[in-house]
Amino acid sequence: MSAEFTYQDVAEHNTKKDLYVVIHDKVYDITKFVDEHPGGEEVLLDVAGQDSTEAFEDVGHSDEAREALEPLLVGTLKRQAGDPKPKAPLPSSLAPAAQTGTATGLGIGLYAVLVLGGLAGFAAYQYLQAQQGATAPSA
């Protein structure tokens, strides 16, 4: 699509029946997708007619979600003086390996802490049970 939109043009499309968003300076008509969005329509209506780059990236959408945007592309954003600055820069690499590596590293560390904490709790429980058994009077 070679159409160019200004922020003012995009801002006019801010209802459930006519919904445009800007993601990384690309304009998408997501009207037909509103009812299908896994996060619900409220999430999309909150960013209707606006630059939703930051909200889109904060959620950490999958590659499939990014691919689903392609057929909804209607043009590009034509920046003008006085327009708000983009809130989130375009990631230098959208490669799944780069994104997954960071998330996986954190996930493994988190699991390690949980497992070690569970083992420490179990060991403390066993120790206290043994101490209670040793100090209990015989009947």
From Swiss-Prot:
UniProt keyword Metal-binding present: yes
Subcellular location: Endoplasmic reticulum membrane; Microsome membrane
Annotated residues for binding of heme: 37, 61
InterPro entries in alphabetical order: Cyt_B5-like_heme/steroid-bd (IPR001199), Cyt_B5-like_heme/steroid_sf (IPR036400), Cyt_B5_heme-BS (IPR018506), Cytochrome_b5 (IPR050668)
Transmembrane segments: 105-125
SUPFAM superfamilies, A to Z: Cytochrome b5-like heme/steroid binding domain
Recorded topology in the membrane: Single-pass membrane protein
Domain Cytochrome b5 heme-binding: 2-78
BP-aspect Gene Ontology terms: sterol biosynthetic process
GO cellular component: endoplasmic reticulum membrane; intracellular membrane-bounded organelle
Keywords in alphabetical order: Electron transport, Endoplasmic reticulum, Heme, Iron, Membrane, Metal-binding, Microsome, Transmembrane, Transmembrane helix, Transport
SMART domains reported for this sequence: Cyt-b5
Any one GO molecular-function label of the UniProt entry: heme binding
Family: Belongs to the cytochrome b5 family.
Biological role stated in the UniProt entry: Membrane bound hemoprotein which function as an electron carrier for several membrane bound oxygenases.
Protein name per UniProt: Probable cytochrome b5
Organism: Neurospora crassa (strain ATCC 24698 / 74-OR23-1A / CBS 708.71 / DSM 1257 / FGSC 987)
